[in-house]
């Protein structure tokens, strides 16, 4: 007769996650998004929201590759938000958090510029996850 395996119920502390590996270039994102100098401040205002979300992802059970995909999609989301500022000048008056909340919803995000169907699906997945994170 085979011996029964008993699973341990001991909770072991998890090692601290070094989130800087996921955002090593985050401070450069606003410059990469900007078309004109006016684009940099709203881009910089998005970064604290992105950092908190990346910290949340890093503390989850997601694999590093999945987290990196979400981080890449955040970069795309920031670029799409800044692009929208050029089409609707009234958006420049809104705080970054509101721009971010308007850009993501329970179904995903807006259509990404020149993105494939696979890229759009991945982007929408990140936007849905970010939407749930931002919900009170």
Which residues does each predicted region cover?
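Charge-rich, intrinsically disordered N-terminal extensions
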Residues: 1-136
